[in-house]
């Protein structure tokens, strides 16, 4: 068997539905957003959107409509999922707890019926008498809305018009009346029917209109006083209500297709329209008042307001603010102004909401060489196309920064005796010290009486008896707070320079070369208590008091030069308690005693970024449990700070890290800053609970995130990225992208807008000897859109487009790889293409082009003609493996720098995906699932090992390990196939067994091995093996990892118990939602644990946790089973959350 754990690292971000309503209360205006399986509820306030609740549905939200039945004070929500679960939800709040109550639910799936090509449509009668659903061709399903019915019952009405494009309920009709656009062999028509609840059938409608525009695609029902419906087409907008017919054909809407609409005014006099190019229009209905007081429609008018993200849905909030929900780019809040700006636009973006979808391709790279992967995705499409750089870490939010190069240390001070908060920041430089006064958010340089400013400061701070201390290279200075004056000064007897110092509120230890001096701080006096000589020079020291020692430290920790040791000495006698040889040649640069979760530790950082950490016994001074991690490559400085009332350590280096403890294990979290040399905590009036951070050039004041999370950076391309790969030698990314150009009158094409491929620093164009340009059988006509494909070379640091190489006309770039071939020392970018002509069912020719990028130039090294489309390529044992239409082909690289075919495998329909491991090749087919090949180096050919005989339409594949293969298919499922090496017959051996099945509810475009969290960090006890990330159309990033059988069984037991305790919204069974479901079959999920459900254990109340753990058997690693406690499971689940 295969046991896997699948979990979300980034929830879906693409918006596929949005509505405005009074859902949380009669007064609140709410925005509800659907992001695939997630429903987000916001309140619209004067300051913007305030999140109220996020609900995870056990289903893909296909319909989301609000309605208010008579007698309700606020709106109810109707939701239908893609697996046909329907529910009516209500918002209930009591005190702090918010609940989404399921008022009614049911499944409205039919046993037979062909799901409509135009998808699921759900509508609600304006009088709230019924819900109408168009799920299958030829059927209209009705759910009567009875007040007290807990179960949603539905019945079907036969619909003669099989191909319905869009349908709506009309306003102001005695009986519920639908209006729809349908297509038949003669064209498209509009028709209306009355729905009779009693007879459960249609009656003739009030009007119909035959032969409307051939591209008519949307119906908008207009409220009273107008009534009737607006039909939106590609070129025209028409209004019908039986008596009146009005049509306009504004040229402005022809450029693109209108895909969404939203009513602005309750009386339906204005509508927003959004098209596929991201343009926003206003449709105005002008009224004419008749003599008898009735109102009729006088005219229709369309105005272009401006450009937004490409809208999937629009909803008007209030005061000219519109939410633009996007699937292809970031969603936006925009303001509609009365007057246009210089560009003639009435639209101003107020806020953007990051969307990673659709993730078309991605790669994991460790750009900063930090042992932590960053994910770079090809996201978005058309003008919303971008690269997204995603990394996990703790964010620092910058509040102020000052250009100050050369800072060597910094400390906060409270200059007056009765202050609670810091008001001063002391900065140390080589040979000088500067003092900054903090006044609110203002920062100004000042002088402190009693302080010296012409020497470097090693330590500065508030100490006992209302005094300040400044330790410089020359002396230790004690200064009274009121009045500010030097009251005591200690110098080394021979006036030698102090090299290192450490101080707490009443003790000082300084090192002068090999000598150590211990001083105590008394009122207006520094008293030398003892001194000693070490064998070697002291490199670093620390006397942080631990435990409840009244602020006094009985211990002194030091790190020495020469013998590279860390030692614990007893104060005041400097007696050696423990000596720890660290080994190696790199000296300790920073040492720190600290307490995490009431356990004491000694941390010691070396000059090469390595960190040793030990358990510390504060009674005996003994060190235990020695462990080592690598945090960076530069010397590391350790400083403590407090956040959320726990102690944390900040390790300053070229790779800043926060160290904290969770479940008595140290956790190392990346901080999203390039480098930090020094830091100190700062808590001033203007900057509460902040950190001051210094790098080589700047001082920054900021606040720190409480938890680590994904941070996303956007590099806009303004065109569609398709494929990405990373090339370490040239420190570049290769990206395949395509832009849209329009045929102009001269026969050439022009780009619609500036984008990455037209703005590159340099560019080149393919000229191929293989295809003469005249062979193109297809002539484009004026105004037609053509795709132009490019290879972009993008700098890994600045993400600047260094070079753009344009492929031939009609040539689509499909696959990309960066690799070395054979004995050739060069690394190449290799691109696989196809010549795409509209009249060909599948491409008949394409090419493989080998490029080399060096010294800022891109050269074509070789090209190879192929008979088909090069869908996928991978480097394979120094050769190039490619899939071309139905063939898998291996090329070797000759000394003449040419590609020569070595062998082929033909048994596929369309080989779209290739993954390799050792000599094994996994092939993902368009419709014939996966196939495993082995390459035989001796014979130089492929052998078919086994295949999955289930007809899965593949969207991505990956090799988990030698025997297990992961696949994603087009009905949003994941499955794992296993090679059965132990099988006795050839027949059995040739079958890949499906051992894992799971409904993900997401369309996976790409799998890749890698992780978003720190790797190689010493010890980990997570029970998982390996990590495969995946990216989906909705912008979700997920992770699949393998479990041992015992862990799988524990988590499966836990999952079943959680399902009894956690009530799902809409009363949808978890087992139903996760069951593997295609048009052919439905099977229960197996071999997969739903990590999102497991992790929800951390969010439930303590009593519910107790319910889950009751009588649960748990092996704590000793091999003995015992009853688990809630804390055992919290520990287990927290471990699992760390893998992403």
From Swiss-Prot:
Location (main, coarse): cytoplasm
Keyword Nucleus: yes
Gene3D superfamilies documented for this protein: 1.10.150.910, YVTN repeat-like/Quinoprotein amine dehydrogenase (2.130.10.10)
The encoding gene: DDB1
Subunit: Component of the UV-DDB complex which includes DDB1 and DDB2; the heterodimer dimerizes to give rise to a heterotetramer when bound to damaged DNA. The UV-DDB complex interacts with monoubiquitinated histone H2A and binds to XPC via the DDB2 subunit. Component of numerous DCX (DDB1-CUL4-X-box) E3 ubiquitin-protein ligase complexes which consist of a core of DDB1, CUL4A or CUL4B and RBX1. DDB1 may recruit specific substrate targeting subunits to the DCX complex.
Disulphide bond pairs: none
Cross-link (Glycyl lysine isopeptide (Lys-Gly) (interchain with G-Cter in SUMO2)): 1121
Record GO cellular component, one term: Cul4-RING E3 ubiquitin ligase complex
Protein name: DNA damage-binding protein 1
Family recorded in the similarity comment: Belongs to the DDB1 family.
Positions of post-translational N-acetylserine modification: 2
């Amino acid at each position: 068997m295969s046991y896997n754990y699948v979990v979300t690292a980034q929830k879906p971000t693409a918006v596929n539905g949005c509505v405005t309503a009074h859902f949380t209360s009669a007064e609140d205006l709410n925005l509800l957003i659907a992001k695939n399986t997630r429903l987000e509820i916001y309140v619209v306030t004067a300051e913007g959107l305030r999140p109220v609740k996020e609900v995870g549905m056990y289903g893909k939200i296909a319909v989301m409509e609000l309605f208010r039945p008579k007698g309700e004070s606020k709106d109810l929500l109707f939701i239908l999922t893609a697996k046909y679960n329907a529910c009516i939800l209500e918002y209930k709040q009591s005190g702090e707890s918010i609940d989404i109550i399921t008022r009614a639910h049911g499944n409205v799936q039919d046993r037979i019926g062909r799901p409509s090509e135009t998808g699921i449509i759900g509508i609600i009668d304006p009088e709230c008498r019924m819900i109408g659903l168009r799920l299958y061709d030829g059927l209209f399903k009705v759910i009567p809305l009875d007040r007290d019915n807990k179960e949603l019952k539905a019945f079907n009405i036969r619909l003669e018009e099989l191909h319905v494009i869009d349908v709506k309920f009309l306003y102001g009709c005695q009986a519920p009346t639908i209006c729809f656009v349908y297509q038949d062999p003669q064209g498209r028509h509009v028709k209306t029917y009355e729905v009779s609840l009693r007879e459960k059938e249609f009656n003739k409608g009030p009007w119909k209109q035959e032969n409307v525009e051939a591209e008519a695609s949307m119906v908008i029902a207009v409220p009273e006083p107008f009534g009737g419906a607006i039909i939106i087409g590609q070129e025209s907008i028409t209004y019908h209500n039986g008596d009146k017919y009005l049509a306009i054909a504004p040229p402005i809407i022809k450029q693109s297709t209108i895909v969404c609409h939203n009513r602005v005014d309750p009386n339906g006099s204005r509508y927003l329209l959004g098209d596929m190019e991201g343009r926003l229009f206003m449709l105005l209905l002008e009224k004419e008042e008749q003599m008898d007081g009735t109102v009729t429609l006088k005219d229709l008018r369309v105005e272009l307001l401006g450009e937004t993200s490409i809208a999937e849905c629009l909803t008007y909030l209030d005061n000219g603010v519109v939410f633009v929900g996007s699937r292809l780019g970031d969603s936006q809040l925009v303001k509609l102004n009365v007057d246009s700006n210089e560009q003639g636009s009435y639209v101003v973006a107020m806020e953007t909401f990051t969307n990673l979808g659709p993730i078309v391709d991605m790669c994991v790279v460790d750009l900063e060489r930090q042992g932590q992967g960053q994910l770079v995705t090809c996201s978005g499409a058309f003008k919303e196309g971008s690269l997204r750089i995603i990394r996990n870490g703790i964010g620092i939010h910058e509040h102020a920064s000052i250009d100050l190069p050369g800072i060597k240390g910094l400390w906060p001070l409270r200059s007056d005796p009765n202050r609670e908060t810091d008001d001063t920041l002391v900065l140390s430089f080589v040979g000088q010290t500067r003092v900054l006064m903090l006044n609110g958010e203002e920062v100004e340089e000042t002088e402190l009486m009693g302080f010296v400013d012409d020497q470097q400061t090693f330590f500065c701070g508030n100490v006992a008896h209302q005094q300040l201390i400044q330790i410089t290279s020359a002396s230790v200075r004690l200064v009274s707070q009121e009045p500010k004056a030097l009251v005591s000064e200690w110098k080394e007897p021979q006036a030698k320079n102090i090299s290192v110092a450490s101080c707490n509120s009443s003790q000082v230890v300084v090192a002068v070369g090999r000598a150590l001096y211990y001083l105590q701080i008394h009122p207006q006096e520094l008293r030398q208590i003892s001194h000693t000589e070490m064998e070697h020079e002291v490199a670093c020291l620390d006397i942080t008091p631990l435990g409840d020692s009244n602020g006094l430290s009985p211990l002194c920790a030091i790190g020495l030069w020469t013998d590279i040791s860390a030692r614990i000495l007893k104060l005041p006698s400097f007696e050696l308690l423990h000596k720890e040889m660290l080994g190696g040649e790199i000296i300790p640069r920073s040492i720190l005693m600290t307490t995490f979760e009431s356990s004491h530790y000694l941390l010691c950082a070396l000059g090469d970024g390595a960190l040793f950490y030990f358990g510390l016994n504060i009674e005996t001074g003994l060190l235990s449990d020695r462990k080592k991690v690598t945090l960076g490559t530069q010397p590391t400085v350790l400083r403590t700070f407090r956040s959320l009332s726990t102690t944390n350590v900040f390790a300053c280096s070229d790779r800043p890290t926060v160290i904290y403890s969770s479940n008595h294990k140290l956790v190392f979290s990346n901080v999203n800053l390039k480098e930090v040399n020094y830091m100190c905590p700062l808590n001033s009036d203007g900057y509460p609970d902040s950190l001051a951070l210094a790098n080589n050039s700047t001082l920054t004041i900021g606040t720190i995130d409480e938890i680590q999370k994904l941070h996303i950076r956007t590099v806009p391309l303004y065109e569609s990225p398709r494929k990405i790969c990373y090339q370490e030698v040239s420190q570049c990314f290769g990206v395949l992208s395509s832009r849209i150009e329009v045929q102009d009158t001269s026969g050439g094409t022009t780009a619609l807008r500036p984008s990455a491929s037209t703005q590159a620093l340099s560019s080149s164009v393919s000229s191929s000897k293989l295809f003469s340009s005249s062979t193109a059988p297809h002539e484009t006509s004026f105004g037609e859109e053509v795709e132009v494909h490019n290879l972009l070379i993008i700098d890994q640091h600045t993400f600047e487009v260094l070079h753009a190489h344009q492929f031939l006309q009609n040539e689509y770039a499909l696959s990309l790889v960066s690799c070395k071939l054979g004995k050739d020392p060069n690394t190449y970018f290799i691109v696989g293409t196809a010549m795409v002509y509209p009249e060909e069912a599948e491409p008949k020719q394409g090419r493989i082009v080998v490029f080399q990028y060096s010294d800022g130039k891109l050269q074509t090294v070789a090209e190879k003609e192929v008979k088909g489309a090069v869908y996928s390529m991978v480097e394979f044992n120094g050769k190039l493996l490619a899939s071309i239409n139905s063939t898998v082909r291996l090329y070797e690289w000759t000394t003449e720098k040419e590609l020569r075919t070595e062998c082929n495998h033909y048994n596929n329909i369309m080989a779209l995906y290739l993954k390799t491991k050792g000599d094994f090749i996994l092939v993902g087919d368009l419709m014939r699932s996966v196939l495993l090949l082995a390459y035989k180096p001796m014979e130089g050919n492929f052998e078919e090992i086994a295949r999955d005989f289930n007809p899965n339409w593949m969207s991505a594949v990956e090799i988990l390990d030698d025997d297990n293969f992961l696949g994603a298919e087009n009905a949003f499922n994941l499955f794992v196939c296993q090679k059965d090496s132990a099988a006795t017959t050839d027949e059995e051996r040739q079958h890949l067994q499906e051992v894992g099945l799971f409904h993900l509810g997401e369309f996976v475009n790409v799998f890749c091995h890698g992780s978003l969290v720190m790797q190689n960090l010493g010890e980990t006890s997570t029970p998982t093996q390996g990590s495969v990330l995946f990216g989906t159309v909705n912008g979700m990033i997920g992770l699949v990892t393998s479990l041992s059988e015992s862990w799988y069984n524990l988590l499966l037991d836990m999952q079943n118990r959680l399902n009894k305790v956690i009530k799902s919204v809409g009363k949808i069974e978890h087992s139903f939602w996760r069951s593997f479901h295609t048009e052919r079959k439905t099977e229960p999920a197996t071999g997969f644990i739903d990590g999102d459900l497991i992790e929800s254990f951390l969010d439930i109340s303590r009593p519910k946790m107790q319910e889950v753990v009751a009588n649960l058997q748990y092996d704590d690693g000793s091999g003995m089973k015992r009853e688990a406690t809630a804390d055992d499971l919290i520990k287990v689940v927290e471990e699992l959350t760390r893998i992403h």
